[in-house]
């Protein structure tokens, strides 16, 4: 049961909008997804009764449980990023893609690798559930290991492991020296934002007033918000990014007042 909710206001200016999330810049990702045999728009549910009860004009929820049969949006990012890597490979089916995850991102990487006849190796942080590991193992020839490391250490280990073996490291978190692939993943996530905008227009909604996004590691929230901000010319809906109290990294980052990356302990 929720005991309390803390909210902190961040600031957004047009100078903060990255060019790679612009509508035209993300068009190749949408074109790629449309070429996938498994692709179809996921539903945008119209919660009419809830909206009526709460006294608002409309509430709409993007249902990503239908995406590619994987029950999550993550494959949008992994598939696009891996497609760009594979395009440079002489033998795409011989490639190995490595990542660290506690679940859905790993499934996305495994699924995208399988589609190319390639293989994924996934390292999961301590405490990950065996059923989630089994779900990834069930995709192609994926190898999965639940480590004794926390998430950040598992990411570093996966990166070093990929470099040591000549494999491709495909992670949805980046740093100053690792940006291209995380940015490609983030671009992939914008496909669902574009779908939602067009579906809202089908409901007669020119622009939503408010938007709620899950935080996760930040790639989806940042990608979708950045794209939406570009789409509406720097004037996005009032946006709330929600995250658990125990891992409120975005909250602490905004609280710090720093414009750049912020380290959070714990």
Each model region followed by its residue ranges:
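PLP-dependent amino-acid enzyme catalytic core
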Residues: 1-266
């Amino acid at each position: 049961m929720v005991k309390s909710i803390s909210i902190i206001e961040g600031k957004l200016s047009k100078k903060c909008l990255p060019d790679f999330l612009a509508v035209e810049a993300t068009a190749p990702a949408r074109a790629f997804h449309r070429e996938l045999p498994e692709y179809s728009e996921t539903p945008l549910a119209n919660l009419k009764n809830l909206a009526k009860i709460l006294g608002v004009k409309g509430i709409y929820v993007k249902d990503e449980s239908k995406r590619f049969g994987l029950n999550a949006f993550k494959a949008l990012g992994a598939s696009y990023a891996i497609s760009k890597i594979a395009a440079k490979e002489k033998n795409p089916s011989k490639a190995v893609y490595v990542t660290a995850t506690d679940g859905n991102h790993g499934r996305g990487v495994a699924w995208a690798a399988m589609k190319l006849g390639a293989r994924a190796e996934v390292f999961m942080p301590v405490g990950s559930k065996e059923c989630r590991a089994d779900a990834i193992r069930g995709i192609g020839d994926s190898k999965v290991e639940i480590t004794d490391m926390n998430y950040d250490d598992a990411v570093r280990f996966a990166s070093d492991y990929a470099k040591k073996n000549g494999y491709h490291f495909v992670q949805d978190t980046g740093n100053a020296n690792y940006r291209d692939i995380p940015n490609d993943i983030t671009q992939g996530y914008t496909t669902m934002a574009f779908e939602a905008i067009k579906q809202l227009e089908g409901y007669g909604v020119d622009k939503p007033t408010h938007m709620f996004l899950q935080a996760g590691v930040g790639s989806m929230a940042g990608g979708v918000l950045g794209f939406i901000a570009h789409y509406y010319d720097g004037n996005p809906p009032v946006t709330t990014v929600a995250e658990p109290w125990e891992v409120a990294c975005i909250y602490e980052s905004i609280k710090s007042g720093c414009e750049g990356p912020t380290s959070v302990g714990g």
